[in-house]
C-alpha cells in the first residue's frame, strides 16, 4: 500500500522549477512580457515555482512577481505591467527628455559628440540631472520612488526572512571586496536597497551603500544567479529545482563582426552580460554529466530530493545536445538585430510595449517547445 501511495505521489507531484531573469535595462520589458505570459498560462497548475532570481532589470521583474505571489494575488502580472507603464515616458516633456537622452548617448557612442566623464555621485552630475528633469514625474526621475510605489517593502520587512516558496534571489557586486553578492529572501527581508544595488550601473547611478558595503550592478555579479538556485545551502534542500527556466536578454550570436564604434560598444556589453551566465550553465552541465555517470551516491542525492539532472538551456546552439537540455526564453534574432546599446535606456512607451508583446510571444513558444523537448527526452531517475 505504501508503495502505491508513493507511486501516486510521484505521478501527481508538480515539477519544481526556478525562473532566472537576466538584466538588461529597458530591454527587460521583454522579461516582463515573458513573466506575464507564464502567469497567464497558469503554469502553477503543472509546476511549482521554488525560486526566482534576477539581476538589474531582471531583478526588478522578479521582485515584482515574487511580491505579488507572496501576497496571494491571482493575477501577479498586473503589478508588473503597472510598473512598466509607470516607467514609460508620458506627456511631451518626458517623451522629449527620453528622446534627447537616448539620442545623445547614441551620438556619443558613435563618436559624433564629445563625452564628458562625470561621476554620477558628483554634485555637478546631480545638479545637471535635477535641472534636466524639472517638471517631470518623480516616478519617472527617481528609481527608488518608482520601486517603492509598486512594491511594499515595509510589508516585506514585516515578514522577516521568508522560507516560503518561491525563494527570491537578487544579485549584485560588492565594489570594495569584489565578492558576488546574493540577497536571498530566506535569509533576510528583501529591501529596496537590494534592488537598487542590483540596478546600480556605475556610469549612471552612484554605488548603493548597505551597511558598510557599497554595491554595483548585477552585471558584474551573476547575470542572473543560476548556480545558487541548485545549492541547498542557498535555497533549502526541498527547493532544489528540477528545471531552470532562463529569460535571456543578451543575444549569444551575432551574424556580422562589429566595425563601427557604436556596434562594438553594443556587442561588448552583450558579451559582458553573458560571461557569468555561460560559466554557471557550464558548471551545472558538469554536475549533470557527473550525475548521469552515477558519480554521486543515491543516498546523497536523496537528501536533496534530486531524482534526475537539472534541466537547463544550452549555452551555445552549436554545442552537443544533452538529454537535460531545454529551450530558453529569448528574443527572436529579428528583434535582437534591431536593438542597440542605447535601447537599454530607452523608456519610450512604444519601445516598452513592443518588448512586452515580444516577451509574451516568446514565452508561449517556449512552453510549447519545452513540452515537446521533455516528452522526447525523458530523464531516468538516478537515485532510489
Q: For each predicted feature, which ranges?
A:
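Patatin-like phospholipase
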Residues: 1-53, 60-384
